[in-house]
C-alpha cells in the first residue's frame, strides 16, 4: 500500500485519532476494533488494510512517539547536558498523559523495554567505551545500568504529583546524576 497516497494518509490519521481518543477514554484492553472503526468512520476491512490489530496500531503509535523523541535527541546533541535533559523531559511532559496511560496497560513492560532499548542506543552514541572500561566496568552493563535508571526516573517523573516545582527540578537532578557517571 502506497503510504504517500493522500487517501492512505487521511485514513491512517483518522484511525490514529480515533484510537488515541479511545485510548484516553477507556482501558486499552476494552477498546475494540469496532469502536475504533466507528469513531474513525471507516470500515473494518479498511482498518485491516492498514493494521493487523489494535496492538499493531498501538505499536505504530509508540514508534511515532519514539521517532519524535529521536528527532529531539538529534536536535539536542549540540546542547549541554542540562539543556538537553530539559528538552528530553519537555517531550515527556508534553506527552505525559499518553506515556502514563501506556505504562499502565497490561503489556506495558514491552513498551518500557522498547524505550529502554532506545535510551541504550542513544547513550551508546554519546558515551565512549572508555568511560566504563577505564573504571574496570563492562561497557554494556554500564549502559544498561544508566538506561534502567533513566526509565525509573522517567516513571517517577510521569507519576509524580502535580507539584510543578518538584517536576522542574527533575531534569536538573538527572543531569547532575549523569555527570556523576562521567556522562556530562
Residue ranges and their predicted role:
Residues 1, 44, 77-81, 88-90, ...:
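Primarily secretory-pathway and cell-envelope proteins
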Residues 1-8, 184:
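N-terminal intrinsically disordered/low-complexity leader segments
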Residues 9-20, 24, 29-33, 38-41, ...:
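An amphipathic alpha-helix adjacent to DNA-recognition modules
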Residues 23-26, 134-138, 155, 159-161:
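Cytosolic nucleotide-binding catalytic cores of signal-transduction proteins
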Residues 73-76, 99-102, 130, 157-161:
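Secondary-structure edge/capping motif, primarily at the C-terminal ends of alpha-helices
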Residues 87-116, 155:
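Amphipathic alpha-helical segments used for helix-helix packing
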Residues 108-133, 137-151:
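Amphipathic alpha-helical packing segments from all-alpha helical-bundle domains
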Residues 148, 159-184:
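C-terminal peripheral helix-coil segments that are non-catalytic and often amphipathic
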Amino acid at each position: 500500500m502506497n503510504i504517500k497516497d493522500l487517501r492512505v494518509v487521511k485514513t491512517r490519521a483518522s484511525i490514529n485519532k480515533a484510537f488515541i481518543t479511545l485510548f484516553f477514554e477507556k482501558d486499552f484492553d476494552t477498546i475494540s476494533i469496532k469502536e475504533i472503526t466507528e469513531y474513525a468512520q471507516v470500515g473494518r476491512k479498511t482498518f485491516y488494510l492498514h493494521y493487523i490489530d489494535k496492538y499493531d496500531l498501538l505499536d505504530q503509535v509508540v514508534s511515532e512517539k519514539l521517532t519524535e523523541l529521536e528527532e529531539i535527541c538529534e536536535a539536542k546533541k549540540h546542547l549541554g547536558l542540562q539543556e538537553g535533559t530539559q528538552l528530553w523531559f519537555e517531550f515527556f511532559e508534553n506527552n505525559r498523559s499518553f506515556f502514563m496511560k501506556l505504562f499502565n496497560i497490561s503489556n506495558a513492560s514491552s513498551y518500557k523495554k522498547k524505550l529502554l532499548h532506545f535510551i541504550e542506543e542513544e547513550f551508546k552514541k554519546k558515551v565512549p567505551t572508555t568511560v566504563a572500561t577505564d573504571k574496570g566496568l563492562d561497557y554494556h552493563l554500564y549502559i544498561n545500568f544508566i538506561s534502567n535508571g533513566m526509565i525509573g526516573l522517567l516513571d517517577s517523573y510521569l507519576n509524580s504529583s502535580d507539584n510543578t516545582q518538584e517536576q522542574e527540578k527533575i531534569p536538573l537532578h538527572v543531569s547532575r546524576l549523569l555527570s556523576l557517571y562521567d556522562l556530562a
